[in-house]
Amino acid sequence: MHRSITHPTLPALKAKFPNTTYHVAEFRDMITVLVPAQNLLETARFLRDDAALRYNMLCELNGVDYLHYPHATHRFGVNYGLTSIPHNIRLWLKVYLDPENETAPGTPGGEVRDEAAAEQGDPGLRLDSVTSIWPGAEWMEREIYDMFGIFFVGHPDLRRILTWNGFGNFPLRKDYPLRGVGEREKYKIITREGA
């Protein structure tokens, strides 16, 4: 039996952006709005600024690699968990991204020849930064960049946060080898006795 999804945000989005197609999903009373990548910034700004919505808190921001998911139609997803404190409502935004080149520099199987190109990443994995809307996104976007190679355009300080500069790979991608690509062999193991 199909039941319609109701949420106070959905009519507001349809009214504000009549020419944008948003897909909506519900799971355990949580609503997820699938946003086209090119519409992320204007959608996020509207959700924060509209008086009837006021999604003023970004609670969660994460990346997902769907490489081995059986029914996945896209390679990567970026999820934004939003809360409107004044109206006590919650919403998830999801943006799907697909790499243009599966062996782009900085991916396993792709040789890093040009550090600048590797830092910019695959053109298909570029997404507008939401740090101008929710400043708390700054470190979360850096982590997604570092772990998945998704480049956030307009980020004030997009650089690696968990791995070192020049690492050249993105370890949370599903095609990244579980044992790494030589990182363990490059560094001396420090034992408790030798420290």
How does the language model describe each region?
Residues 1-195:
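Terminal low-complexity/charged segments
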